[in-house]
A protein has these predicted regions:
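Generic alpha-helical hydrophobic packing signal
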Residues: 17-19, 24
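Conserved phosphotransfer cores of two-component systems
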Residues: 1-7, 28
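Accessory nucleic-acid engagement/destabilization modules that flank
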Residues: 27, 32-35
Length: 448
């Protein structure tokens, strides 16, 4: 039957209870296995499961979201705490994945609720962010706190730690790949808040230094590169890690590697056994960030990753079919605490917001810094005193603005071309749940 009609569900009904028969049936991918005597309701359940499952799952999912829609809406009218925002974002991502998997027609309803949530989240960040920066003991876990609060305690407890930073990994992308790891690891999921701007130069350096950007520039001026300079902005990460370990009087040896393609991962796999002697190993993988930028610049990649679901699908396919999957299998054998995180997420933008500045203004579409910026104040979080947020101020009159929601900055010159080119691209640097609430995952190898 499977040879003739491979997609036809086959249900085996038998009196035979021998385990090897069951194993053969399961190995042949039968749809169900019933042992006589069979109750009529068992037959009905099997028929429903194999003939009407899609419709039933879709109906139950839609009903579940309709019920939760009202509860989420009520929450958005309240003053949520940082932890409550994390939980609300988890629920929105849960429904996004559930509705996408059932082909539901409720996508527009969810999209509008996410836009409302992001507008409220931006107000929340504007209200609290400066206080978080100025009072580290009163803030949620943020980029500069990761080593101090997540990694050092494990090292102190005698655990070996492997920190894997997947640049530009969003929470929904993590959920898409997490199923690939469930057989090898016990998974503990959390989210943390990135700093602003949600860009690699700032957020990843803050993670590795354990400091805010202005503090890095003041303490290690030779390791910080300002926006207007041409050299790479993240070339000193290993040195920043070393300085952070030194500041906290940690004596552990560490390794650091940055990988941009599958070939580099394959090469690393040949050295994996050498990591076993090192307490802390740090690995940065840039594939998702490269994919995000390629999607903007390449028409073909934009078509392949045209929607949020397609973007997740490419991430999942990359994880499943490249040496990165083998890397995780080998790490599972080394008995490490494996921490997966990222420096920032990204958001699909489709609302242009005009901005005017001089020629020295940076090129990022979600945040700008410079002098004499002209913009729509309702569209941004404006920071006229960067030092209050511990951000560098290359010139005394430099101000920062951060885009909120799904907006992106566009210049009046050649405006229509600019808008058409960047609409529906994934960008980062501003304020949204997708950019700021990012995965912090702990994996522990399962005992065999």
């Amino acid at each position: 039957l499977k040879d003739i009609a491979p997609n036809l569900p086959v249900v085996m009904v038998t009196k035979n209870e021998e385990e090897d028969i069951m194993d053969q049936a399961i190995g042949s991918k039968i749809a169900d296995y019933l042992i006589k005597p069979v109750n009529p309701k068992q037959i009905l359940l099997t028929l429903k499961k194999n003939i009407h499952q899609r419709e039933i799952v879709q109906e139950v999912t839609q009903t579940g979201y309709r019920q939760d829609f009202g509860r989420i809406g009520m929450q958005l009218s309240e003053q949520l705490t940082p932890d409550e925002w994390k939980e609300l974002y988890r629920r929105l991502v849960h429904w996004e994945l559930e509705l996408a998997s059932t082909g539901s027609a409720m996508d527009d309803m969810l999209r509008m609720q996410k836009e409302e949530a992001n507008a409220t989240f931006a107000k929340f960040v504007k209200r609290h962010y400066e206080h978080w920066v100025q009072h580290p003991d009163e803030r949620p876990l943020m980029s500069p706190d990761l080593f101090k609060r997540c990694i050092f305690p494990r090292l102190t407890a005698g655990r070996k730690v492997f920190l894997l930073v997947l640049d530009n990994l969003r929470y929904d992308q993590w959920r898409a790949i997490s199923g690939e790891l469930a057989d090898d690891f016990d998974i503990d999921e959390d989210l943390y808040y990135t700093i602003l701007p949600t860009a690699t130069q700032y957020a990843r350096n803050a993670i590795f230094a354990g400091l805010m950007p202005l503090q890095i520039k003041q303490m290690y001026p030779d390791l910080w590169v300002d926006e207007e300079e041409d050299e790479g902005k993240n070339l000193n990460e290993k040195a920043l890690i070393a300085h952070q370990l030194e500041r906290f009087r940690r004596r552990e040896q560490f390794t650091y590697h940055k990988l941009n393609d599958s070939q580099a991962v394959s090469q690393l796999l040949t050295q994996i056994k050498q990591f076993a002697a090192t307490s802390l190993n740090v690995l940065v993988i840039n594939f998702i960030d490269i994919l995000s930028h390629a999607r903007t610049e390449s028409r073909m990649v934009r078509e392949l990753a045209g929607s949020e679901g397609a973007y997740r699908g490419i991430t999942q396919s990359w994880f499943k079919h490249t040496p990165i999957r083998q890397l995780f299998r080998q790490l599972a054998e080394l008995d490490y605490d494996l921490i997966i995180t990222t420096d920032h997420g990204s958001i699909k933008v489709d609302q242009p917001s005009k901005v005017v500045g001089d020629r020295n203004v940076n090129t990022n579409l979600r945040y700008k810094l410079g002098r004499n910026l002209s913009y729509n104040a309702k569209d941004v979080y404006e920071v006229r005193e960067p030092k209050a947020l511990l951000l560098p101020q290359p010139i005394l009159s430099t101000a920062y603005i951060f885009a909120t929601g799904n907006r992106f900055f566009a210049y009046p010159n050649n405006y229509n071309h600019y808008v058409q080119y960047y609409t529906d691209t994934f960008q980062h640097g501003g304020i949204s749940m997708e950019e700021m609430l990012v995965p912090l995952i702990t994996l522990r190898p399962k005992r065999r």
